Every structure is written in structure tokens, then in C-alpha cells.
């Protein structure tokens, strides 16, 4: 690819990165999509689709493929990072030497930093410094539906008001893709991490066969845990009633397109953690997120009993049914003021 002036460079050619790149290109923008595997990028260029993840969706003419990172980043000041959370910091450090002087970074990655449990904003600042404007997009989005042009809505938050306005204009499409701005940078990030954990729990409940009542209770109390942790970190509690909180939580807990939910279902049916992960065949973000969210909650003194029981299943070999019964057997609580 010769050097071009693109509206956005997307880093990450998995299902979600590809879907976002397709959406941007459909909006009439020139978009460069970069992936870490040159052979995959060459195949996508030949096929003009992502056969591995979205085989039925043809690329718009304005979606350009690039295997050379320096050229991809030279094409646009605005860079959308869509990679798993456990490699987020490594990818940003890889990008930094090639970023334009006027670069701005937005990510659609959902989760916390592996091992440390830090918010991705802290990872980004450490990797990139203080000067680069940052933003995050999050909300109820399945890649296949987004790529198919089905109606979707997300939330957008940024450290920079102009960047937020520019991104909203770039992403928003009145026909299918609605983008809500939100000033709560912490809350929009956190919702996407916690919902992954609760979705595993909802899946486990369904895998056991507990039914719709139990699933709904888990979603509702999971939202309480999300809001409580967010408040401790300085987020606006109302954020968690929006797209990046309740919206993403309901979607991920109730639809089998969710890898986290399917992973939980298999655990509820008695499969082991490794067997369930192997069966999914893609990254199950909630597996790592559970450890990270619980560590963050403990650091801030926030009680999260659902997250604790999911952790026990994933990392301490507790049976999923026993974990559910542990939650049911807790002492009576006041709904509004207790975990």
C-alpha cells in the first residue's frame, strides 16, 4: 500500500477490529486496517473479506489492508486499537515509535491490564506519555451484527473534548450506528471489564439449568457490583445504567454470541476450565478479567460476592453449582446498601 491519508487506522484484524473498520469505511471514510500476521493481511486483501471471522461481509472499497505497521500509522493521526486486554500495553509500546506527532489514540478493548488490574487509561499513559489524547468506545456490540450493518449503539468517552467530538462525528451513522458521548472516562472503561465476569456467571447459571429467574438476578446484582466498584474508583454511577454498563451487561449475559457466556455455560455443564476455553477457540476475556476485577475490588475494599464465586470456580476448582449455592446461602441483606 502506498502512503495514504486515511480518516482512521485500526490496529487489530480480529472480528471486532474488522467489524469496526468495515463500519467506518461504510460511513464513507478511508480506513487502514493493520494486523500482526502479514499472511492473514495478504489473504484478506486477496479475498476482500475476513474469511477467518466475518466470511460473509465484503470489504468496502475504502477499507485498505496494511501489514507494515509504520505505513499503517503514517496514514492517519487517529488510531483505533482493538486487541485483547492482556496484550494492550505491549501493542501500544510497539506503536509508539511510529505514531505521528499529532496522533490521537482510541481503543475498543474491554478489560483491565493482566496481573495488575489497572485501568487501560493508566496502561496507555505509561506506554505513550501524557500528551497524546485518549478515548475509549464501549457498549453492546457483537462483531457479526455490527459488520452486517444491523442497528447498534455504543458509548464514547475521552480525555479531550475535541477528540470526543471528532470521533462521534467519524463513527456515528444515522442508518445503523449510534454513538453517545459520555464524560465518564473511568466508568466507560470499567463497565466492559466487569460485564465479562458477570456474563460467565450468567452462563454458568444457565448451564446448570437454573432458569431465567436466576439469570436475571445475577444480571441485576452484577450491575450492583459493577456500580459499587465504579463508584469506588471515581466513576459516575449513572454511567452503569447506560450503554457501557447495563447495555453491554444484558447483551453479554443473554446471547450465545458472547464467548464469555458460552464459556460459563460449559462450566455449568461440568466441563473443566481448559476444556471450555479450548472449545471456544478464541480469547475469553472474562477469564483473565475475573482475577483482575477481584484484585481491584480488594484493593479498594469493595465487596463483590458474585465475582468472588466466579473466581473460585475459575482458579480454585470450585464446582459451579457449589458456587451458586454459596451465593444463595449468604446471610440476608438489604438490597440497596449491601453486596
From Swiss-Prot:
NADPH binds at residues 15-16, 36, 110, 143, 259, 283, 285. GO terms for biological process: carbohydrate metabolic process; glycerol-3-phosphate biosynthetic process; glycerol-3-phosphate catabolic process; glycerophospholipid biosynthetic process. The active site is at 195 (proton acceptor). It is found in: Cytoplasm. Its main location: cytoplasm. Coiled coil: none annotated. GO terms for molecular function: glycerol-3-phosphate dehydrogenase [NAD(P)+] activity; NAD binding. Keywords: Cytoplasm, Lipid biosynthesis, Lipid metabolism, NAD, NADP, Nucleotide-binding, Oxidoreductase, Phospholipid biosynthesis, Phospholipid metabolism. Its EC number is 1.1.1.94. NCBIfam families: PRK00094.1-1, PRK00094.1-2, PRK00094.1-4. Catalyzes the reduction of the glycolytic intermediate dihydroxyacetone phosphate (DHAP) to sn-glycerol 3-phosphate (G3P), the key precursor for phospholipid synthesis. PANTHER family: GLYCEROL-3-PHOSPHATE DEHYDROGENASE (PTHR11728), GLYCEROL-3-PHOSPHATE DEHYDROGENASE [NAD(+)] 2, CHLOROPLASTIC (PTHR11728:SF1). Belongs to the NAD-dependent glycerol-3-phosphate dehydrogenase family. This is Glycerol-3-phosphate dehydrogenase [NAD(P)+].
Amino acid at each position: 500500500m502506498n502512503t495514504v491519508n486515511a480518516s482512521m487506522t485500526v490496529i487489530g484484524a480480529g472480528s471486532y477490529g474488522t467489524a469496526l473498520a468495515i463500519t467506518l469505511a461504510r460511513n464513507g471514510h478511508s480506513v487502514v486496517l493493520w494486523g500482526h500476521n502479514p499472511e492473514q493481511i495478504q489473504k484478506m486483501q486477496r479475498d476482500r473479506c475476513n474469511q477467518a471471522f466475518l466470511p460473509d461481509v465484503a470489504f468496502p472499497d475504502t477499507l485498505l489492508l496494511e501489514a507494515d505497521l509504520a505505513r499503517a500509522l503514517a496514514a492517519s493521526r487517529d488510531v483505533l486499537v482493538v486487541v485483547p486486554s492482556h496484550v494492550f500495553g505491549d501493542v501500544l509500546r510497539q506503536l509508539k515509535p511510529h505514531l505521528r506527532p499529532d496522533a490521537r489514540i482510541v481503543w475498543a478493548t474491554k478489560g483491565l491490564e493482566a496481573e495488575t488490574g489497572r485501568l487501560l487509561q493508566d496502561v496507555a499513559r505509561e506506554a505513550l506519555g501524557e500528551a497524546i489524547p485518549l478515548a475509549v468506545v464501549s457498549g453492546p456490540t457483537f462483531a457479526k451484527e455490527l459488520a452486517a450493518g444491523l442497528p447498534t449503539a455504543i458509548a464514547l468517552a475521552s480525555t479531550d473534548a475535541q477528540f470526543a467530538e471528532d470521533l462521534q462525528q467519524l463513527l456515528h451513522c444515522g442508518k445503523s450506528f449510534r454513538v453517545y458521548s459520555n464524560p465518564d472516562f473511568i466508568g466507560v472503561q470499567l463497565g466492559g471489564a466487569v460485564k465479562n465476569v458477570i456474563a460467565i456467571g450468567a452462563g454458568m447459571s444457565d448451564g446448570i439449568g437454573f432458569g431465567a429467574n436466576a439469570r436475571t438476578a445475577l444480571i441485576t446484582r452484577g450491575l450492583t457490583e459493577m456500580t459499587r466498584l465504579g463508584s469506588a474508583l471515581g466513576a459516575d454511577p449513572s454511567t452503569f445504567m447506560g450503554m457501557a454498563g447495563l447495555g453491554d451487561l444484558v447483551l453479554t449475559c443473554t446471547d450465545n454470541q458472547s464467548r464469555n457466556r458460552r464459556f460459563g455455560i460449559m462450566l455449568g455443564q461440568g466441563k473443566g476450565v481448559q476444556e471450555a476455553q479450548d472449545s471456544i477457540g478464541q480469547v475469553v476475556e472474562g477469564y483473565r478479567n475475573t482475577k483482575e476485577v477481584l484484585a481491584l475490588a480488594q484493593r479498594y475494599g469493595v465487596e463483590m460476592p458474585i465475582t468472588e464465586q466466579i473466581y473460585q470456580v475459575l482458579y480454585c476448582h470450585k464446582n459451579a453449582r457449589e458456587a451458586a449455592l454459596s451465593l444463595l446461602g449468604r446471610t440476608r441483606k438489604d438490597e440497596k446498601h449491601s453486596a
